[in-house]
């Protein structure tokens, strides 16, 4: 279900929200739920970092292959020049 995150505001349906841990902050709700929320958040952050790393790796690979292609052309041209002479 949809969770609304209010920062400086609380109402009964929101379980006194303060901080960024969702509605599990006040410790009367359930300590396990609080820990679970924190764990899930950490997991999501980790997954996101992995995704970002993968993205940059892809970019790097693309650049590398482009460079290799360019080098290939360069070497062929050099070989042709040597053949000319």
From Swiss-Prot:
Turritoxin PaIAb was only sequenced until Met-61. Its main location: secreted. Belongs to the turripeptide family. One of its GO terms (cellular component) is extracellular region. Keywords: Secreted, Toxin. The lineage of its organism: Eukaryota, Metazoa, Spiralia, Lophotrochozoa, Mollusca. Expressed by the venom duct. GO terms for molecular function: toxin activity. Is lethal to drosophila larvae. The keyword Protease does not apply. It is found in: Secreted. It comes from Polystira albida (White giant-turris). It comes from the Eukaryota. This is Turripeptide PaIAa.
